[in-house]
Protein backbone atom coordinates (compact mmCIF):
# COMPACT_ATOMS: atom_id res chain seq x y z
CA UNK A 1 0.00 0.00 0.00
CA UNK A 2 2.83 2.42 0.81
CA UNK A 3 4.32 2.27 -2.70
CA UNK A 4 1.03 2.10 -4.62
CA UNK A 5 0.59 4.23 -7.73
CA UNK A 6 -2.99 5.39 -7.33
CA UNK A 7 -2.07 9.04 -7.32
CA UNK A 8 -2.15 11.63 -10.07
CA UNK A 9 -0.76 15.13 -10.25
CA UNK A 10 0.11 17.25 -13.24
CA UNK A 11 3.92 17.17 -13.74
CA UNK A 12 4.27 20.93 -14.18
CA UNK A 13 7.33 22.48 -12.52
CA UNK A 14 6.15 24.37 -9.43
CA UNK A 15 7.61 27.74 -8.47
CA UNK A 16 10.39 27.89 -5.87
CA UNK A 17 10.76 26.93 -3.07
CA UNK A 18 8.50 23.94 -3.76
CA UNK A 19 10.12 20.57 -4.56
CA UNK A 20 10.56 19.46 -8.19
CA UNK A 21 7.88 17.30 -9.86
CA UNK A 22 9.85 14.08 -9.56
CA UNK A 23 9.69 14.50 -5.77
CA UNK A 24 5.97 15.37 -5.77
CA UNK A 25 5.11 12.31 -7.86
CA UNK A 26 6.63 9.82 -5.39
CA UNK A 27 3.51 8.40 -3.71
CA UNK A 28 5.15 6.60 -0.78
CA UNK A 29 5.08 9.60 1.55
CA UNK A 30 1.44 10.33 0.84
CA UNK A 31 0.37 6.74 1.39
CA UNK A 32 2.46 6.46 4.55
CA UNK A 33 0.78 9.61 5.85
CA UNK A 34 -2.63 8.02 5.31
CA UNK A 35 -1.56 4.86 7.12
CA UNK A 36 -0.32 6.88 10.09
CA UNK A 37 -3.51 8.94 10.15
CA UNK A 38 -5.58 5.75 10.13
CA UNK A 39 -3.53 4.44 13.06
CA UNK A 40 -4.18 7.70 14.93
CA UNK A 41 -7.90 7.36 14.19
CA UNK A 42 -7.85 3.81 15.62
CA UNK A 43 -6.29 5.10 18.85
CA UNK A 44 -8.86 7.89 19.04
CA UNK A 45 -11.60 5.30 18.38
CA UNK A 46 -10.34 3.25 21.33
CA UNK A 47 -10.46 6.30 23.61
CA UNK A 48 -13.98 7.10 22.41
CA UNK A 49 -15.04 3.47 22.87
CA UNK A 50 -13.92 3.50 26.49
CA UNK A 51 -16.00 6.62 27.12
CA UNK A 52 -19.09 5.31 25.33
CA UNK A 53 -19.00 1.67 26.48
CA UNK A 54 -17.20 1.89 29.81
CA UNK A 55 -15.48 -1.44 29.06
CA UNK A 56 -11.86 -1.37 27.84
CA UNK A 57 -12.05 -4.91 26.39
CA UNK A 58 -15.14 -4.08 24.32
CA UNK A 59 -13.56 -0.78 23.26
CA UNK A 60 -10.37 -2.57 22.19
CA UNK A 61 -12.30 -5.12 20.14
CA UNK A 62 -14.40 -2.40 18.51
CA UNK A 63 -11.28 -0.38 17.67
CA UNK A 64 -9.65 -3.47 16.14
CA UNK A 65 -12.73 -4.09 13.99
CA UNK A 66 -12.56 -0.46 12.90
CA UNK A 67 -8.84 -0.80 12.11
CA UNK A 68 -9.12 -3.85 9.84
CA UNK A 69 -12.58 -3.49 8.30
CA UNK A 70 -12.16 -3.67 4.50
CA UNK A 71 -14.76 -0.95 3.88
CA UNK A 72 -12.12 1.54 5.07
CA UNK A 73 -9.53 0.47 2.47
CA UNK A 74 -10.63 3.25 0.12
CA UNK A 75 -10.04 5.96 2.72
CA UNK A 76 -6.56 4.66 3.58
CA UNK A 77 -5.28 3.47 0.19
CA UNK A 78 -6.66 6.37 -1.84
CA UNK A 79 -4.68 9.53 -1.14
CA UNK A 80 -7.77 11.66 -1.66
CA UNK A 81 -9.27 9.93 1.39
CA UNK A 82 -7.00 11.98 3.65
CA UNK A 83 -9.81 14.50 4.16
CA UNK A 84 -12.00 11.79 5.72
CA UNK A 85 -9.13 10.57 7.89
CA UNK A 86 -8.34 14.03 9.22
CA UNK A 87 -11.98 14.88 9.84
CA UNK A 88 -12.65 11.57 11.61
CA UNK A 89 -9.59 11.98 13.84
CA UNK A 90 -10.72 15.38 15.09
CA UNK A 91 -14.35 14.26 15.42
CA UNK A 92 -13.44 11.16 17.43
CA UNK A 93 -11.46 13.33 19.87
CA UNK A 94 -14.28 15.88 20.10
CA UNK A 95 -16.79 13.09 20.63
CA UNK A 96 -14.66 11.57 23.40
CA UNK A 97 -14.41 14.92 25.19
CA UNK A 98 -18.16 15.36 24.85
CA UNK A 99 -18.70 12.12 26.79
CA UNK A 100 -16.92 13.56 29.84
CA UNK A 101 -18.90 15.07 32.74
CA UNK A 102 -20.24 18.54 32.02
CA UNK A 103 -17.90 21.46 32.60
CA UNK A 104 -18.66 25.12 32.86
CA UNK A 105 -16.73 26.06 29.73
CA UNK A 106 -15.01 23.77 27.22
CA UNK A 107 -12.83 25.38 24.56
CA UNK A 108 -11.10 22.33 23.11
CA UNK A 109 -14.23 20.52 21.84
CA UNK A 110 -15.37 23.41 19.57
CA UNK A 111 -11.79 23.82 18.33
CA UNK A 112 -11.61 20.12 17.41
CA UNK A 113 -14.97 20.43 15.65
CA UNK A 114 -13.69 23.46 13.73
CA UNK A 115 -10.59 21.52 12.67
CA UNK A 116 -12.86 18.73 11.39
CA UNK A 117 -14.97 21.25 9.46
CA UNK A 118 -11.85 22.65 7.81
CA UNK A 119 -10.80 19.10 6.90
CA UNK A 120 -14.12 18.02 5.36
CA UNK A 121 -17.36 19.96 4.99
CA UNK A 122 -19.51 16.93 5.81
CA UNK A 123 -18.36 17.16 9.42
CA UNK A 124 -21.31 19.51 10.07
CA UNK A 125 -23.37 16.38 10.72
CA UNK A 126 -21.47 15.91 14.00
CA UNK A 127 -23.70 18.48 15.72
CA UNK A 128 -26.86 16.26 15.79
CA UNK A 129 -24.68 13.27 16.71
CA UNK A 130 -23.25 15.25 19.63
CA UNK A 131 -26.72 16.32 20.75
CA UNK A 132 -27.96 12.73 20.58
CA UNK A 133 -24.96 11.61 22.64
CA UNK A 134 -25.64 14.08 25.46
CA UNK A 135 -29.42 13.74 25.41
CA UNK A 136 -29.69 9.97 25.07
CA UNK A 137 -26.41 8.32 25.97
CA UNK A 138 -25.32 10.68 28.75
CA UNK A 139 -28.87 11.07 30.10
CA UNK A 140 -28.96 14.88 30.03
CA UNK A 141 -32.28 16.62 29.72
CA UNK A 142 -33.23 18.25 26.45
CA UNK A 143 -32.27 21.74 27.63
CA UNK A 144 -29.00 20.60 29.19
CA UNK A 145 -28.01 18.66 26.06
CA UNK A 146 -28.83 21.67 23.89
CA UNK A 147 -26.82 23.98 26.16
CA UNK A 148 -23.84 21.62 26.11
CA UNK A 149 -23.81 21.34 22.31
CA UNK A 150 -24.84 24.93 21.50
CA UNK A 151 -21.27 26.05 20.58
CA UNK A 152 -21.03 23.16 18.10
CA UNK A 153 -24.37 24.11 16.55
CA UNK A 154 -23.33 27.75 16.23
CA UNK A 155 -20.10 26.72 14.51
CA UNK A 156 -22.00 24.44 12.12
CA UNK A 157 -24.49 27.19 11.18
CA UNK A 158 -21.75 29.78 10.63
CA UNK A 159 -19.70 27.37 8.55
CA UNK A 160 -22.66 26.40 6.36
CA UNK A 161 -23.60 30.05 5.85
CA UNK A 162 -20.04 30.88 4.80
CA UNK A 163 -19.85 27.82 2.55
CA UNK A 164 -23.17 28.63 0.89
CA UNK A 165 -21.98 32.18 0.18
CA UNK A 166 -19.14 30.76 -1.92
CA UNK A 167 -21.52 28.92 -4.25
CA UNK A 168 -21.31 25.23 -5.22
CA UNK A 169 -17.88 23.81 -6.07
CA UNK A 170 -17.03 24.00 -9.74
CA UNK A 171 -16.75 20.22 -9.94
CA UNK A 172 -20.36 19.89 -8.76
CA UNK A 173 -22.03 22.46 -11.00
CA UNK A 174 -22.38 19.96 -13.84
CA UNK A 175 -22.96 16.23 -13.75
CA UNK A 176 -24.24 16.17 -10.18
CA UNK A 177 -26.74 13.61 -9.03
CA UNK A 178 -30.24 15.09 -8.85
CA UNK A 179 -32.69 12.84 -6.96
CA UNK A 180 -36.21 12.26 -8.17
CA UNK A 181 -39.18 12.84 -5.92
CA UNK A 182 -41.88 10.49 -4.69
CA UNK A 183 -41.62 6.73 -4.48
CA UNK A 184 -38.46 6.39 -6.65
CA UNK A 185 -36.55 8.61 -4.23
CA UNK A 186 -37.88 6.67 -1.23
CA UNK A 187 -36.90 3.31 -2.73
CA UNK A 188 -33.49 4.69 -3.69
CA UNK A 189 -32.92 6.00 -0.16
CA UNK A 190 -33.94 2.68 1.39
CA UNK A 191 -31.63 0.85 -1.01
CA UNK A 192 -28.72 3.12 -0.05
CA UNK A 193 -29.34 2.56 3.67
CA UNK A 194 -29.61 -1.19 3.15
CA UNK A 195 -26.48 -1.23 1.00
CA UNK A 196 -24.48 0.55 3.70
CA UNK A 197 -25.68 -1.93 6.32
CA UNK A 198 -24.80 -4.82 4.01
CA UNK A 199 -21.31 -3.42 3.36
CA UNK A 200 -20.67 -3.19 7.09
CA UNK A 201 -22.02 -6.62 7.97
CA UNK A 202 -21.02 -8.52 4.81
CA UNK A 203 -17.99 -6.81 3.20
CA UNK A 204 -17.48 -9.32 0.38
CA UNK A 205 -18.71 -7.27 -2.59
CA UNK A 206 -16.89 -3.97 -2.23
CA UNK A 207 -16.23 -1.80 -5.25
CA UNK A 208 -14.62 1.54 -5.99
CA UNK A 209 -17.49 3.25 -7.77
CA UNK A 210 -21.26 3.13 -7.26
CA UNK A 211 -22.16 5.81 -9.81
CA UNK A 212 -25.05 4.46 -11.84
CA UNK A 213 -27.01 3.19 -8.85
CA UNK A 214 -29.82 5.63 -9.56
CA UNK A 215 -30.40 4.17 -13.04
CA UNK A 216 -29.77 0.51 -12.15
CA UNK A 217 -32.60 -1.92 -11.30
CA UNK A 218 -33.50 -1.82 -7.62
CA UNK A 219 -31.69 -4.36 -5.45
CA UNK A 220 -34.54 -5.95 -3.49
CA UNK A 221 -32.19 -7.36 -0.84
CA UNK A 222 -30.78 -3.91 -0.03
CA UNK A 223 -34.24 -2.33 -0.14
CA UNK A 224 -35.47 -5.02 2.25
CA UNK A 225 -32.57 -4.36 4.63
CA UNK A 226 -33.37 -0.65 4.60
CA UNK A 227 -37.07 -1.28 5.29
CA UNK A 228 -36.20 -3.74 8.06
CA UNK A 229 -33.79 -1.29 9.69
CA UNK A 230 -36.36 1.52 9.70
CA UNK A 231 -39.11 -0.80 10.94
CA UNK A 232 -36.98 -2.09 13.83
CA UNK A 233 -35.97 1.43 14.87
CA UNK A 234 -39.58 2.67 14.76
CA UNK A 235 -40.84 -0.37 16.69
CA UNK A 236 -38.22 0.07 19.38
CA UNK A 237 -38.95 3.78 19.73
CA UNK A 238 -42.71 3.31 19.94
CA UNK A 239 -43.11 0.07 21.90
CA UNK A 240 -39.85 -0.80 23.62
CA UNK A 241 -38.64 2.44 25.17
CA UNK A 242 -37.90 0.80 28.51
CA UNK A 243 -35.18 -1.26 26.82
CA UNK A 244 -33.40 1.81 25.44
CA UNK A 245 -31.27 2.63 28.48
CA UNK A 246 -27.65 3.27 27.46
CA UNK A 247 -26.43 0.34 29.54
CA UNK A 248 -28.73 -2.13 27.79
CA UNK A 249 -27.75 -3.95 24.62
CA UNK A 250 -30.88 -2.75 22.82
CA UNK A 251 -30.16 0.85 23.77
CA UNK A 252 -26.62 0.61 22.43
CA UNK A 253 -27.90 -0.99 19.24
CA UNK A 254 -30.40 1.79 18.53
CA UNK A 255 -27.88 4.50 19.47
CA UNK A 256 -25.24 3.03 17.13
CA UNK A 257 -27.53 2.75 14.12
CA UNK A 258 -29.11 6.14 14.82
CA UNK A 259 -25.63 7.70 14.67
CA UNK A 260 -24.92 5.80 11.43
CA UNK A 261 -28.17 7.07 9.89
CA UNK A 262 -27.38 10.65 10.91
CA UNK A 263 -23.95 10.59 9.31
CA UNK A 264 -25.46 9.31 6.06
CA UNK A 265 -27.98 12.11 5.73
CA UNK A 266 -27.72 14.00 2.42
CA UNK A 267 -26.41 17.06 4.28
CA UNK A 268 -23.27 15.10 5.09
CA UNK A 269 -22.42 15.18 1.38
CA UNK A 270 -23.55 18.78 0.81
CA UNK A 271 -26.04 18.32 -2.05
CA UNK A 272 -25.51 18.48 -5.01
CA UNK A 273 -23.35 15.38 -4.73
CA UNK A 274 -21.30 13.60 -7.35
CA UNK A 275 -21.70 10.10 -5.92
CA UNK A 276 -24.94 8.94 -4.35
CA UNK A 277 -23.23 6.08 -2.53
CA UNK A 278 -19.56 5.56 -1.67
CA UNK A 279 -17.66 3.44 0.83
CA UNK A 280 -15.64 6.41 2.04
CA UNK A 281 -18.80 7.95 3.54
CA UNK A 282 -18.81 5.13 6.11
CA UNK A 283 -15.48 5.97 7.74
CA UNK A 284 -16.87 8.16 10.51
CA UNK A 285 -20.37 6.69 10.84
CA UNK A 286 -19.25 3.07 10.98
CA UNK A 287 -17.44 3.46 14.32
CA UNK A 288 -20.50 3.37 16.66
CA UNK A 289 -21.81 0.28 14.85
CA UNK A 290 -18.44 -1.48 15.09
CA UNK A 291 -18.15 -0.50 18.77
CA UNK A 292 -21.57 -2.03 19.39
CA UNK A 293 -20.50 -5.21 17.59
CA UNK A 294 -17.33 -5.26 19.68
CA UNK A 295 -19.33 -4.87 22.90
CA UNK A 296 -21.66 -7.69 21.86
CA UNK A 297 -18.76 -9.98 20.97
CA UNK A 298 -16.93 -9.18 24.21
CA UNK A 299 -19.93 -10.33 26.25
CA UNK A 300 -21.52 -13.09 24.15
CA UNK A 301 -18.89 -14.65 21.88
CA UNK A 302 -15.82 -16.72 22.80
CA UNK A 303 -12.52 -14.92 22.55
CA UNK A 304 -11.35 -17.27 19.78
CA UNK A 305 -14.38 -16.35 17.64
CA UNK A 306 -13.71 -12.64 18.08
CA UNK A 307 -10.04 -13.10 17.12
CA UNK A 308 -11.06 -15.16 14.08
CA UNK A 309 -13.44 -12.40 12.95
CA UNK A 310 -10.69 -9.78 13.25
CA UNK A 311 -8.31 -12.02 11.29
CA UNK A 312 -10.84 -12.62 8.49
CA UNK A 313 -11.52 -8.90 8.17
CA UNK A 314 -7.77 -8.22 8.11
CA UNK A 315 -7.29 -10.69 5.23
CA UNK A 316 -10.19 -9.13 3.30
CA UNK A 317 -8.77 -5.67 3.92
CA UNK A 318 -5.33 -6.74 2.67
CA UNK A 319 -6.88 -8.18 -0.50
CA UNK A 320 -8.90 -5.02 -1.00
CA UNK A 321 -5.79 -2.88 -0.57
CA UNK A 322 -3.99 -4.86 -3.28
CA UNK A 323 -6.75 -3.88 -5.71
CA UNK A 324 -6.12 -0.23 -4.89
CA UNK A 325 -2.44 -0.48 -5.88
CA UNK A 326 -3.21 0.04 -9.58
CA UNK A 327 -6.08 1.22 -11.72
CA UNK A 328 -6.64 -1.81 -13.95
CA UNK A 329 -7.29 -4.34 -11.15
CA UNK A 330 -9.35 -1.77 -9.26
CA UNK A 331 -11.71 -0.86 -12.09
CA UNK A 332 -11.70 -4.40 -13.45
CA UNK A 333 -13.06 -5.74 -10.16
CA UNK A 334 -15.60 -2.92 -10.12
CA UNK A 335 -16.90 -3.81 -13.59
CA UNK A 336 -17.16 -7.48 -12.61
CA UNK A 337 -19.00 -6.71 -9.36
CA UNK A 338 -21.39 -4.04 -10.64
CA UNK A 339 -22.19 -4.26 -14.35
CA UNK A 340 -24.30 -1.08 -14.09
CA UNK A 341 -21.37 1.04 -12.79
CA UNK A 342 -20.76 2.80 -16.10
CA UNK A 343 -18.04 5.13 -14.81
CA UNK A 344 -15.97 2.10 -13.84
CA UNK A 345 -16.00 1.13 -17.52
CA UNK A 346 -14.81 4.64 -18.37
CA UNK A 347 -11.95 4.46 -15.87
CA UNK A 348 -10.99 0.98 -17.05
CA UNK A 349 -10.93 2.28 -20.63
CA UNK A 350 -8.58 5.09 -19.54
CA UNK A 351 -6.34 2.63 -17.70
CA UNK A 352 -5.99 0.36 -20.74
CA UNK A 353 -5.45 3.30 -23.11
CA UNK A 354 -2.57 4.61 -20.95
CA UNK A 355 -0.89 1.21 -20.45
CA UNK A 356 2.32 1.59 -22.46
CA UNK A 357 3.49 -1.93 -21.55
CA UNK A 358 1.00 -3.46 -24.02
CA UNK A 359 1.22 -3.46 -27.83
CA UNK A 360 -0.82 -0.72 -29.43
CA UNK A 361 -3.36 -3.10 -30.99
CA UNK A 362 -3.95 -4.95 -27.72
CA UNK A 363 -4.19 -1.68 -25.81
CA UNK A 364 -6.77 -0.32 -28.24
CA UNK A 365 -8.83 -3.51 -28.28
CA UNK A 366 -9.03 -3.72 -24.48
CA UNK A 367 -9.82 -0.02 -24.10
CA UNK A 368 -12.66 -0.25 -26.63
CA UNK A 369 -14.05 -3.35 -24.92
CA UNK A 370 -14.09 -1.51 -21.57
CA UNK A 371 -15.82 1.49 -23.16
CA UNK A 372 -18.47 -0.80 -24.67
CA UNK A 373 -19.10 -2.32 -21.23
CA UNK A 374 -19.79 1.13 -19.84
CA UNK A 375 -22.01 2.06 -22.79
CA UNK A 376 -24.15 -1.02 -22.22
CA UNK A 377 -24.81 0.24 -18.71
CA UNK A 378 -25.42 3.88 -19.70
CA UNK A 379 -25.69 4.70 -23.43
CA UNK A 380 -26.32 8.36 -22.56
CA UNK A 381 -22.90 8.90 -20.94
CA UNK A 382 -21.14 11.44 -23.16
CA UNK A 383 -17.83 10.76 -21.41
CA UNK A 384 -17.82 7.18 -22.66
CA UNK A 385 -18.50 8.17 -26.27
CA UNK A 386 -15.80 10.83 -25.97
CA UNK A 387 -13.26 8.34 -24.61
CA UNK A 388 -14.10 5.76 -27.27
CA UNK A 389 -13.53 8.32 -30.02
CA UNK A 390 -10.29 9.44 -28.38
CA UNK A 391 -8.97 5.85 -28.26
CA UNK A 392 -9.80 5.34 -31.93
CA UNK A 393 -8.14 8.64 -32.80
CA UNK A 394 -4.97 7.60 -30.96
CA UNK A 395 -5.01 4.34 -32.90
CA UNK A 396 -4.89 6.27 -36.19
CA UNK A 397 -8.51 5.58 -37.16
CA UNK A 398 -10.09 9.05 -37.54
CA UNK A 399 -12.90 7.70 -39.72
CA UNK A 400 -13.98 5.23 -37.02
CA UNK A 401 -13.60 7.94 -34.37
CA UNK A 402 -16.14 10.27 -36.01
CA UNK A 403 -19.39 8.42 -35.04
CA UNK A 404 -18.66 8.17 -31.28
CA UNK A 405 -17.36 11.75 -31.22
CA UNK A 406 -20.49 12.98 -32.99
CA UNK A 407 -22.58 11.12 -30.41
CA UNK A 408 -20.58 12.66 -27.56
CA UNK A 409 -21.01 16.11 -29.10
CA UNK A 410 -24.78 15.63 -29.39
CA UNK A 411 -24.99 14.62 -25.72
CA UNK A 412 -22.65 17.37 -24.45
CA UNK A 413 -22.53 20.15 -27.09
CA UNK A 414 -20.70 22.55 -24.74
CA UNK A 415 -17.77 20.24 -24.04
CA UNK A 416 -14.70 21.94 -25.62
CA UNK A 417 -12.59 18.77 -25.50
CA UNK A 418 -15.13 16.84 -27.56
CA UNK A 419 -15.27 19.71 -30.08
CA UNK A 420 -11.49 19.70 -30.36
CA UNK A 421 -11.33 15.94 -30.94
CA UNK A 422 -14.10 16.17 -33.52
CA UNK A 423 -12.26 18.90 -35.43
CA UNK A 424 -9.01 16.95 -35.11
CA UNK A 425 -10.64 13.83 -36.56
CA UNK A 426 -12.03 15.79 -39.50
CA UNK A 427 -8.65 17.40 -40.15
CA UNK A 428 -6.87 14.04 -40.14
CA UNK A 429 -9.56 12.51 -42.31
CA UNK A 430 -9.27 15.35 -44.85
CA UNK A 431 -5.62 14.49 -45.49
CA UNK A 432 -6.44 10.84 -46.20
CA UNK A 433 -10.01 10.80 -47.52
CA UNK A 434 -10.99 14.30 -48.70
CA UNK A 435 -14.38 13.18 -50.03
CA UNK A 436 -15.33 11.53 -46.74
CA UNK A 437 -14.18 14.61 -44.82
CA UNK A 438 -16.30 16.94 -46.96
CA UNK A 439 -19.28 14.65 -46.41
CA UNK A 440 -18.69 14.64 -42.65
CA UNK A 441 -18.36 18.43 -42.52
Task: Give residue ranges: language-model regions.
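Alpha-helical linker/edge segments of TPR/alpha-solenoid repeat scaffolds
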Residues: 357-358, 426-437
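Residue-level recognition of tetratricopeptide repeat
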Residues: 350, 390, 424-431
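TPR/TPR-like (Sel1-like) alpha-helical repeat modules
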Residues: 409-410, 423, 427, 440-441
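Tandem repeat domain/solenoid detector
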Residues: 397, 406-410
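Polytopic membrane enzymes that build or remodel cell-surface glycoconjugates and lipids
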Residues: 1-359, 363-394, 417
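Single-residue signature of alpha-solenoid repeat helices
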Residues: 367, 401, 437-440
Amino acid sequence: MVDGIFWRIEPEPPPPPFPPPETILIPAGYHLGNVLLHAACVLAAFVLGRRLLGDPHAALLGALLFAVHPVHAENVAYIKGRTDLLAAFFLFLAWARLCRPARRFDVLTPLLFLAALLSREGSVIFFPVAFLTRWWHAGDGFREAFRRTLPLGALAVLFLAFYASLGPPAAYREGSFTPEGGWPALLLGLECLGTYIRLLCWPFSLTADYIGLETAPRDLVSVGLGVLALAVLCLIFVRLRRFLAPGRAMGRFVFAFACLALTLLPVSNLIPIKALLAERYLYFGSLPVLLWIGAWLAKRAPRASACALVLVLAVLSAARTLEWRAEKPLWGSCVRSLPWAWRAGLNLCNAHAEDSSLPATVRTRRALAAADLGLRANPAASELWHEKGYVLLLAGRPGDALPPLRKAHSLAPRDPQTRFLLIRSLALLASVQPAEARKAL
